[in-house]
Amino acid sequence: DTSYNHGQSVSDMNIWRKKAWATVPALDETKIPALVASVKAAGIYVTPTNYFFFSSFADSIGADTYRNRPDFAYIPSKIKEERWKVREAYWKKAPPLASRNKYKDIRQKMTYALWKAGVPLMAGSDSPEWFLVQGFSIHDELATFVSAGISPYHALESATKNPLTYLG
């Protein structure tokens, strides 16, 4: 598949590739304003899915934390077993903490910059990926918007008004 460069950079397509994490130090947040301007000029709606990327690849969430989440009970046992093996394999040798933190920081800054510029954001969670359960995971996604600096009111718009506007 030549649609993206396997292992060349940390992007949504390559984040699960360990070698790609070596590119995080090269991420340049000074490029965010130009990217935001291009997105705004194109009239694009953006669905960051930050919680999926953070919880799956950037945050080392322990087994007890996962198992104590209220949504964990709604994941079928067979899926839990399969996904747990994949997750454990990924986290056996985690990317460096500094890289994971920088990745999260830049995504949060970009999310905030997009919102501040008036780019319509839409909340999405990529549920049912990994351990994301419909309903619960959208609340987690909204929390990432608020932690990025977006007001709770505007975070809620990303799950209500903005998708309505997008769909017409």
Predicted segments, located by residue:
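Mid-to-C-terminal alpha-helical segments outside catalytic/metal-binding sites
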Residues: S151-T165
